[in-house]
Amino acid sequence: GLPWYRVHTVLINDPGRLIAAHLMHTALVAGWAGSMALYELATFDPSDPVLNPMWRQGMFVLPFMARLGVTGSWSGWSITGETGIDPGFWSFEGVALAHIVLSGLLFLAACWHWVYWDLELFRDPRTGEPALDLPKMFGIHLFLAGLLCFGFGAFHLTGLFGPGMWVSDPYGLTGSVQPVAPEWGPDGFNPYNPGGVVAHHIAAGIVGIIAGLFHILVRPPQRLYKALRMGNIETVLSSSIAAVFFAAFVVAGTMWYGSATTPIELFGPTRYQWDSSYFQQEINRRVQASLASGATLEEAWSAIPEKLAFYDYIGNNPAKGGLFRTGPMNKGDGIAQAWKGHAVFRNKEGEELFVRRMPAFFESFPVILTDKNGVVKADIPFRRAESKYSFEQQGVTVSFYGGELNGQTFTDPPTVKSYARKAIFGEIFEFDTETLNSDGIFRTSPRGWFTFAHAVFALLFFFGHIWHGARTLFRDVFSGIDPELSPEQVEWGFYQKVGDVTTRK
């Protein structure tokens, strides 16, 4: 028999069962997607889209449905917070059901093709020999893929026949599903511009349709056909793996660095938004604008959306996860309940002090307070006997603006220190750690898991491409033949069915 790593060679000269294997694989993928969607719906809590969004709950397939326009449930809730809605058939449950039904039909098709493997379709009508016209099949597949790509861009995304896609502002506050017009100018190449997604699907679809028709109608030159081994099914495998690993690298990048197709409302913020103080700068800009228009500090900070403040918290940074830390973010720091408000620290001279924030890759970080010039004015010392900047010595107090503790000031050092320790993580929130038995160790968001998985798959598939590409290009070199072997062990197509001695020609 064959060793376990060579079992797929039984499909090399057997188009019928190659189709069956692919149908079964698609059935498994569609079945997984539908089942996973139902599992996530069973565990998803839609009650607080601001402080307990899907990405905090570790949802993996829901955000992908939402970005394509599915936002409602047959239970009447929507991910944007509405209740009592009627989403029609294309709800989360409807999509899950469609995938499970598709999976069942594909399973039956796989069984049929496994039993009826020897079809007239796979034989050359001129010779009666088994033969596949691979260049023509490539053209047909390219044409169909181009048609799908064009249809998705021109109809689904534009809203002409479909819902559009998830569109939001740069700070992930006002997202919703909207029809999107294509952006044909240079701004279409901005990865954060949804119009570019539409334009590129339309353009790529047209190119795919034209290229597909070309490959259906035009035969490859003989020298090129032989040089690229176009008659060998392993060439198809090698080039297909190349396409897939390239796509996996691309989506790992767009997910980790962020793009219009990976909105932060659905997948959580990127690590670079914490690293660059992206949300902190926007919050400060809004506060300064409010103060300039005559608002008090309390009013200015109370106007900051809780959603924006929550993004400015290190626990939502996907780089704060870790290997083997399974589970959703809520299993780490807990389920966020409320924003405590913005903490402002001052020393006994009344000078405002700023807590230095923890960089992404630190697990622990000292509590250091600096003035506006970056000069250290207070800290929580490791060795109290030698301290000069302790909270007690510097008379540090904390006042809260906005949030639950709006307008309150605390002066007792233990309380002030407890808030300073929390302030190194960004804005301060109250968490429920009991419901999920949260352990206090940060987890990554679906953004981190998706990136990690696709980077790993891409690397593995890259080696698969090299392996199968080398095998198809150098097959004659690799398969050096022992002259003592009998013809049936050597000759391709000696048996009509591989390994079946009853089908000898």
Curated annotation (Swiss-Prot):
Cytoplasmic topological domain residue ranges: 1-19, 115-138, 218-235, 472-505
Binding-site residues for chlorophyll a 13, renumbered to this chain: 215
Binding site for chlorophyll a 2: 8
Record localization: Cellular thylakoid membrane
Major localization class: membrane
Residues bound to chlorophyll a 1: 468
GO cellular component: photosystem II; plasma membrane-derived thylakoid membrane
Residues the record lists as binding chlorophyll a 3: 22
Record-listed chlorophyll a 4 binding positions: 25
Residue numbers binding chlorophyll a 5: 141
Residues noted as binding chlorophyll a 16 in the record, renumbered to the chain: 465
A Pfam entry, by short name: PSII
Binding residues annotated for chlorophyll a 9, in chain numbering: 201
Binding site for chlorophyll a 7: 454
Record-listed chlorophyll a 11 binding positions: 113
Keywords for this protein: Chlorophyll, Chromophore, Magnesium, Membrane, Metal-binding, Photosynthesis, Photosystem II, Thylakoid, Transmembrane, Transmembrane helix
Entry binding sites for chlorophyll a 8: 99
TM spans (from-to): 20-35, 100-114, 139-155, 202-217, 236-251, 456-471
Membrane topology of the entry: Multi-pass membrane protein
Residues where chlorophyll a 14 binds: 200
Cited function: One of the components of the core complex of photosystem II (PSII). It binds chlorophyll and helps catalyze the primary light-induced photochemical processes of PSII. PSII is a light-driven water:plastoquinone oxidoreductase, using light energy to abstract electrons from H(2)O, generating O(2) and a proton gradient subsequently used for ATP formation.
Family as reported in the entry's similarity comment: Belongs to the PsbB/PsbC family. PsbB subfamily.
Protein name: Photosystem II CP47 reaction center protein
